[in-house]
Regions:
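Outer-envelope beta-barrel architecture signal
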Residues: 5, 20-28, 62-68, 124-130, ...
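Transmembrane beta-strands of outer-membrane beta-barrel pores
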Residues: 32-38, 72-78, 118, 134-140, ...
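Residues that define the transmembrane beta-barrel architecture of outer-membrane proteins
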Residues: 22-26, 44-50, 64, 106-112, ...
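Outer-membrane beta-barrel "beta-signal"
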Residues: 162, 190-203
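Extracellular loop and loop/strand-boundary signature of outer-membrane beta-barrel proteins
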Residues: 37-42, 99-103, 140-146, 181-187
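Short glycine/proline- and aromatic-enriched beta-strand/turn motifs that initiate or cap beta-hairpins
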Residues: 19-68, 72, 202
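Membrane-embedded beta-strand positions of outer-membrane beta-barrel proteins
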Residues: 26-32, 66-72, 114, 130-134, ...
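Gram-negative (and chloroplast) outer-membrane scaffold detector with strong preference
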Residues: 51-139
Length: 203
């Protein structure tokens, strides 16, 4: 439901953007972040990632600013199954899969997230914001929690920004969920907590 609502909002904003062009509304940025799974006895998952971010300022009111953004991302992760009983005996070749999945794995995720951001300026140079984003991704490794291939990444973040002329510095804690949306039988996915640091430039 949340995913459908965000997609509808992004579509409406994209239509509005196509009807008006104003280059001063755009910013281009780069973020680096890292994180790990919430405490979990079944598996470990640690990651670090790089994002390019294209912001578009949709609207400015007296108290708030509204932006949309596109975020191409590459994510480098390490995952290991800790509780091999997570792979049930009814799973085909379950003993072989247990032996396979319990090994430490390197995972690459290639993501294209689209987000909606609500910003609250504090004075002239500072602001706080809330960001929600969703998007498709490709993962290159099968695990006991998710099939290899197509999936989705959902992110909910809060952030703090500091502006200096046309440059903006960001710190952004977030919660991230990835899964394949039921497109494959293996769909437990991952839940991680992360923090990002970024810089962007107003074009």
């Amino acid at each position: 439901m949340i995913r459908k609502l965000l997609l509808s909002i992004l579509f409406l904003f994209a239509v509005k953007i196509s009807a008006q062009e104003d280059k001063s509304r755009f910013s281009l940025g780069f973020n680096y972040g890292f994180g790990s799974e919430f405490n979990n006895r079944n598996y470990t998952f640690t990651n670090h990632f790089y994002k390019i971010q294209l912001y578009y300022k949709l609207k400015q009111t007296k108290h708030f600013q509204y932006q949309i953004l596109v975020q191409p991302e590459i994510n480098f992760a390490e995952h290991q199954l800790l509780n091999f009983y997570f792979v049930k005996p009814e799973t085909p070749d379950y003993e072989q899969k247990r032996a396979q999945y319990i090994q430490l794995k390197d995972i690459r995720e290639y993501v294209l997230n689209c987000g909606f951001l609500v910003r609250k300026p504090i004075g002239e140079i500072c602001s706080f914001y809330i960001l929600g984003s969703i998007g498709p991704m490709i993962t290159d490794t099968e695990t006991e929690r998710m099939s290899k291939g197509f999936a989705f990444a959902d992110v909910l973040a809060v952030g703090f920004s500091l502006n200096y002329h046309k440059i903006q510095f960001d710190i952004r804690p977030n919660i991230r969920h990835v899964s394949n949306g039921g497109l494959s039988s293996t769909n437990s996915g991952y839940n991680t907590r992360n923090i990002e640091f970024g810089v962007s430039y107003s074009l």
